[in-house]
Amino acid sequence: MAGITDGRFCCKMTSLGFDLLTLGGYNADHNAIDAGLKIIKRGRLEFNIAKEDLYHHITKEVKLIKNQSHYTGEVSVNLRSSSPDQIIEISKIPELDIVEINAHCRQPELIESGCGQALLKNPEILQDFTSEVVRKCKKKVSVKIRANVHGVDDVMIAKAVNEAGADYIHIDAMKPGFNCADYSVIESVRKNVDIFIIGNNSIRDLKSARHMLKSGADGISIARAAIKGTIPFDLTLV
């Protein structure tokens, strides 16, 4: 959650049973940073970190989490960028476990800059983008996508991410007009790819968490339900 999930926020999550905590999304290149500034001007939360300071900033945030002695999980960072270069650069942070390509955020400013959801418009471009990150970084790679975007074939996108060699596909199974996830998207993707699926959207209790896993996700992610620094159910019971 941009402007929210920094190291201090993630530290609140370290004792709740998560095996992965994700920082970001951070605006990683000049196009994304410029878009982020426009978003801030209209009153939305964003991380505002200069490109030349981002490596040091994320390093500090990752170390803050890893220094929690009771936390033995991994740390990921979600990055918005119109090109792979800065994502590859951030992947060099020694303490970081996973870089996540943001093909998910739908703010108009980001889409116009070629970031976030804009990457879903052409599966070949997304595959090439992801392949370059996979090829040139030595960390695990995740790609976060948004489901049910007009004109986008979710299965084709998942196949592109899979073919690119990513380790994870993180699916926001958004169901427009409904206050629940579109579990059928997870089912369709599961039938077509072998990649590790992280299911996201409206996971707020044991029922929704179990439904996501039953639909074919290998793991779940929680965002808004954790906004107060805790979660409303016991992860060990999922």
Q: Residue ranges of each PLM-predicted region?
A:
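Hydrophobic faces of well-ordered beta-strands that scaffold small-molecule active sites
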Residues: 1, 19-24, 73-79, 99-101, ...
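Glycine-rich phosphate-binding active-site loops on the catalytic face of alpha/beta enzymes
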Residues: 21-31, 98-110, 164-178, 215-236
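Active-site-adjacent beta->alpha loops and helix N-cap segments on the catalytic face
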Residues: 32-37, 56-62, 84-86, 105-138, ...
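Helix C-cap/helix->beta junction micro-motif
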Residues: 71, 136-137, 164-165, 193
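Well-ordered, non-transmembrane segments within structured domains
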Residues: 73-112, 125, 151-162
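Histidine/lysine/aspartate-rich catalytic loop segments that bind and position anionic ligands
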Residues: 139-142, 146-175
